[in-house]
Amino acid sequence: MGPERKLYLKLKKNTDRIKWTRLENISLLGTPDLLGNNDSGNFFTVELKVTKGKKVKFSPHQIAFHVEHPHNSHILIEALGPRSSKLIGWYLYRGSRIKELVTQGLRLEPDAWGSDPSSLMLVAWPLEPEA
């Protein structure tokens, strides 16, 4: 099982107020990994990333998706310690910030962060709708 699949399972297990649909799409490159639906009936997308350093890797298609769809899109990053699987933290960014995230990596201040999915839920789920 890949690291992003493990991240999805942790997120799904600990965010029971959100209905998740995993989007495994090979025909539309760049489509985010998850479609979420919260208690308020709002839909949003989430791109999942797992990294062991400050840099976060995105494909050109993923960047293009978030540039084209900046509202109600998010990027959730699980940061692990270098050369280990020890969790450092979870970082949540709005999709509209993808260009900054590409250049600055995890040095960019997140919109929300925590040490587990439930702490993120208290801080950020659901994020306030963007204007």
What are these regions (language model features)?
Residues 51-70:
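Mg2+/Mn2+-dependent nuclease catalytic core
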